[in-house]
């Protein structure tokens, strides 16, 4: 099992993540109702195990959670400032973050052994996926060497100010990826104030969303952009079956 934390890293080549020609398309599933966190993790882990065993195809699962906080493998209890919502300890890399309505979570279950067994290149590919997705809305986002996630410069707030618009936290088991990304579309940003998001306490670095930046988008718009950008980086997708994961 491999976890990816927020330790400093070099920007790595994210290309060559597409599978070999003739590989099955990645299933693309969207849940319309909020999914409880324990249920989502159990479902994701079962599917990842089936992928590793060659019994299921790869999957991207888009969903929202009810309001909650998660602590990754580098999380610290002191980063929870207020106990507003349930806190779940999880196996992904990273520290504390908030999930809730208005945030698009994408759980990505890919067989990196078939694609490219390079965990840091995979994280860079996830960053590029987010950057390409938000570029469809004319939002210029950037990655940072010392801060995992995707950031937007905020000169309106002051020199050197940046806000995180999307978070990344992954885990690999038998080279199958678990967890994934979270893009802030229209969440209640005040809930991030109850934690030290991703362990970053510097006041120059905050949190934003598409709507906070003045874009009148809805979740469906983001889902369409996510799928198009994903296919350019990771390969073809197909709609998942109506029932089951």
From Swiss-Prot:
Pfam families per UniProt: LplA-B_cat
Enzyme's top EC category: transferase
UniProt catalytic activity: octanoyl-[ACP] + L-lysyl-[protein] = N(6)-octanoyl-L-lysyl-[protein] + holo-[ACP] + H(+)
Major localization listed first in the record, in broad terms: cytoplasm
PROSITE patterns found in the cross-reference section: BPL_LPL_CATALYTIC (PS51733), LIPB (PS01313)
Residues at the active site: 198 (acyl-thioester intermediate)
Disulphide bridges, residue numbers: none
Alphabetical list of InterPro entries matching this protein: aa-tRNA-synth_II/BPL/LPL, BPL_LPL_catalytic, Octanoyltransferase, Octanoyltransferase_CS
Enzyme Commission number(s) of this protein: 2.3.1.181
Chain coiled-coil ranges: none
UniProt-listed SUPFAM superfamilies: Class II aaRS and biotin synthetases (SSF55681)
Ranges of residues in domain BPL/LPL catalytic: 54-238
Record key words, sorted: Acyltransferase, Cytoplasm, Transferase
Domain of life of the native organism: Bacteria
Pathway: Protein modification; protein lipoylation via endogenous pathway; protein N(6)-(lipoyl)lysine from octanoyl-[acyl-carrier-protein]: step 1/2
Keyword Cell wall biogenesis/degradation recorded: no
GO molecular function: lipoyl(octanoyl) transferase activity
Entry keyword Cytoplasm: yes
Compartments where found: Cytoplasm
GO biological process annotation, one example: protein modification process
Note: In the reaction, the free carboxyl group of octanoic acid is attached via an amide linkage to the epsilon-amino group of a specific lysine residue of lipoyl domains of lipoate-dependent enzymes.
Function in brief: Catalyzes the transfer of endogenously produced octanoic acid from octanoyl-acyl-carrier-protein onto the lipoyl domains of lipoate-dependent enzymes. Lipoyl-ACP can also act as a substrate although octanoyl-ACP is likely to be the physiological substrate.
Family from the record: Belongs to the LipB family.
The protein's name in its UniProt record: Octanoyltransferase
Phylogenetic placement of the source organism: Bacteria, Pseudomonadati, Pseudomonadota, Alphaproteobacteria, Hyphomicrobiales
């Amino acid at each position: 099992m491999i976890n990816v934390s927020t330790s400093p890293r070099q920007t790595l080549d994210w290309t060559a993540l597409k599978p070999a020609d003739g590989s099955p398309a990645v299933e693309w599933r969207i849940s319309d109702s909020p999914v409880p966190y324990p249920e989502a993790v159990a479902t994701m882990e079962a599917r990842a195990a089936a992928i590793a065993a060659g019994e299921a195809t790869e999957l991207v699962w888009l969903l929202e959670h009810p309001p909650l906080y998660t602590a990754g493998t580098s999380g610290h209890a002191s980063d929870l400032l207020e106990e507003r919502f349930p806190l779940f300890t999880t196996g992904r890399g990273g520290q504390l973050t908030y999930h809730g309505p208005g945030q698009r979570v994408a759980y990505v279950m890919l067989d990196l052994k078939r694609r490219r067994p390079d965990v840091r290149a995979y994280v860079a590919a996830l960053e590029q996926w987010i950057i390409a997705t938000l570029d469809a809305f004319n939002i210029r986002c950037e990655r940072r060497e010392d801060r995992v996630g995707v950031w937007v410069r905020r000169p309106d707030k002051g020199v050197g100010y940046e806000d995180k618009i999307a978070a990344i936290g992954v885990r690999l088991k038998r080279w199958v990826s678990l967890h994934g990304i979270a893009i802030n579309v229209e969440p209640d940003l005040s809930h991030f104030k109850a934690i030290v998001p991703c362990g970053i306490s510097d006041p120059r670095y905050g949190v934003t969303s598409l709507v906070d930046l003045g874009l009148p988008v809805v979740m469906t718009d983001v889902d369409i952009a996510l799928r198009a950008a994903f296919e350019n980086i990771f390969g073809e997708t197909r709609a998942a079956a109506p029932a089951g994961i």
